[in-house]
Amino acid sequence: MNRLQLLSKGLRLIHKMSEEALAGVPLVHISPEGIFKYVMINVFDGGDASKAVIRGFADCTWHADIFEREEEVFKKLGLRAECPGGGRIEHNPEKKYLKVYGYSQGFGKADHAQTKRILATKYPDYTIEISDEGY
């Protein structure tokens, strides 16, 4: 096998690994309850594949804190991340209720309708409301 064939084989292997890493990224990871900031993150593998995920943590003061935490995780998997926006989530597991609203001052407003669709993959039995009201 010549050097070009080895390089090509190696690149295919790396691409396959990043595709598998992307497939393993959960769509939703949010705090189990409370009101907290969230971000939508577009995660990309080394090729053309990508997916949008939702992250929100009560222990993060700023939207950027959430993004930076998750970006490090994705980098370790060989993935790239971008944040198109954020907002807030109210999570009441007792009532099986999620409310998505507001915006991020740093990243802008996420597409709350898309956020709702993504949240519904993890919380199919919840009532999920979206609103453009509030911060």
Swiss-Prot record:
SUPFAM superfamilies: PHP14-like (SSF143724). The active site is at H63. One of its GO terms (molecular function) is protein histidine phosphatase activity. It comes from the Eukaryota. Substrate binds at K37, S104, Q105, G106. GO terms for biological process: cell differentiation; sex differentiation. GO terms for cellular component: cytosol. Keywords: Differentiation, Sexual differentiation. Somatic and germline cells. Isoform B is expressed in both sexes and in somatic and germ line cells. Isoform A is expressed in males and is germ line specific. Transcription of janA gives rise to two sex-specific and one non-sex-specific transcripts. Belongs to the janus family. JanA and janB regulate somatic sex differentiation. This is Sex-regulated protein janus-A. It comes from Drosophila melanogaster (Fruit fly). The gene is janA.
